[in-house]
């Protein structure tokens, strides 16, 4: 089956054609600041991004005869994981999303191309997948509720692949999935549902190459009201300029890990501290799963680092077997989900938020 995959990022658009799960063609480009400067809101980029995708297809002489089109899910209202058919409610919510990101355009572009192909259009496991158990939502401040934002697509895809590799279904296993990238999410996967996970985007859990993670609340409040920073600057500290970037002036984990492996400070101390916060979060998810954990999966780009994996395994491998599944194959994960929906192996969900 021919599956067309669309993945719009903040400064890039990636597309690929799969025959079943095999990639046969891929293209994309980085969009410069000049390219996007005329657009004041991400929604205004719709025609630009759609025309870019169609132009690449035309240049490669690829006809619009796909069996399915699937896009990276956008920042929708909280919804359970799975494969979703793109419907009018979804498109409305993406166009009116509270959070602005280019991934919100993926489903809109996929839907239009699918209409020309007379084929189904899907998204799968968007970042806002919310399967939290009730106790995981409450905080000590009634006005503040924990929310679920994490690397759902990759986390669930590697979970399914691991389950298949041992002859099981994802829904039969309890897993801790540690996604190690620019942001870090550590989730408790209980029989196919992520019942607890840190908010990997907005300042919770481990610190990461670009994000601050959990910060002592009193000191953060004092910083906010010190008069030194705007709200925008504080938010940038939490997401974008926090973590390794704040301490070391860089987010390049390859370079930092090399220096750390040679014992060079402050690189070793800061990187080891980050990994310590990751291990603590994995331990918390072990408690969430009541110690019944089939495996701990390490995934994402940082899982390619022997240094980081070695430090982490030394802190958590007594909890459960540690499985290494490095990298983040978003395009392959999306194709896998579309194929599963087409074959009826994965149930097709209806987007109908409460």
Locations of regions flagged by a protein language model:
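Short glycine-rich, Thr/Ser-proximal phosphate-binding strand/loop in the N-terminal lobe
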Residues: 3-44
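Conserved phosphate-binding/catalytic loops in two-lobed NTP-binding clefts
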Residues: 306, 310-336
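Structural signal for terminal/edge beta-strands and the immediately following C-terminal loop/tail
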Residues: 326-354
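Glycine-rich phosphate-binding loop plus the immediately following alpha-helix
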Residues: 105-111, 123, 138, 143-174, ...
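Glycine-rich phosphate-binding loops at beta-strand->alpha-helix junctions
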Residues: 293-312
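Phosphate/pyrophosphate-binding loops at sites that engage ATP/ADP/AMP, CoA/4′-phosphopantetheine
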Residues: 55-68, 165-169, 282-294
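Short beta-strand-loop/turn "lid" adjacent to the catalytic site in phosphate-handling enzymes
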Residues: 57-103, 120, 128-140
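Adenine-nucleotide phosphate-binding core of ATP-dependent small-molecule kinases
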Residues: 236-290
């Amino acid at each position: 089956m021919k599956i067309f995959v669309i993945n719009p990022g903040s400064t890039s658009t990636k597309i690929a054609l799969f025959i079943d799960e095999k990639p046969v063609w891929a293209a994309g480009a980085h969009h410069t600041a000049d390219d996007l400067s005329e657009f004041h809101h991400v929604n205004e980029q719709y025609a630009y991004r759609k025309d870019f995708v169609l132009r690449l297809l035309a240049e490669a002489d690829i006809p619009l005869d796909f069996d399915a089109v699937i896009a990276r899910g956008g920042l929708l209202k909280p919804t359970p994981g799975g494969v979703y058919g793109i419907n009018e409610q979804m498109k409305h919510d993406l166009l009116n999303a509270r959070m602005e990101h280019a991934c919100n355009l993926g489903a809109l572009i996929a839907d239009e191309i699918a209409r020309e192909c007379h084929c189904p259009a899907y998204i799968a496991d968007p970042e806002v997948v919310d399967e939290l158990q009730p106790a995981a939502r409450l905080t000590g401040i009634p006005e503040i509720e924990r929310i679920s934002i994490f690397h759902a697509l990759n986390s669930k895809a590697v979970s399914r692949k691991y389950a298949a590799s041992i002859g099981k279904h994802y829904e039969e296993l309890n897993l801790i999935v540690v996604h190690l990238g620019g942001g870090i999410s550590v989730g408790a996967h209980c029989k196919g549902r992520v019942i607890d996970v840190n908010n990997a985007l907005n300042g919770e859990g481990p610190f990461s190459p670009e994000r601050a993670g959990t910060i002592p609340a009193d000191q953060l409040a004092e910083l906010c009201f010190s008069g030194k920073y705007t709200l925008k600057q504080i938010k940038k500290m939490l997401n974008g300029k926090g973590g390794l970037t704040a301490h070391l002036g860089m987010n390049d984990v390859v370079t930092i890990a090399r220096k750390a492996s040679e014992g060079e400070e402050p690189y070793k101390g800061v990187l080891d501290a980050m990994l310590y916060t990751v291990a603590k979060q994995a331990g918390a998810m072990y408690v969430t799963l009541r110690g019944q954990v089939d495996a701990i999966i390490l995934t994402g780009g940082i899982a390619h680092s022997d240094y980081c994996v070695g430090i982490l395994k030394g802190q958590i491998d007594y909890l459960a077997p540690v499985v290494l599944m490095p990298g983040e194959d978003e395009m392959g994960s999306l194709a896998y989900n579309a194929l599963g929906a087409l074959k009826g192996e994965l149930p097709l969900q209806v987007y109908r938020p409460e």
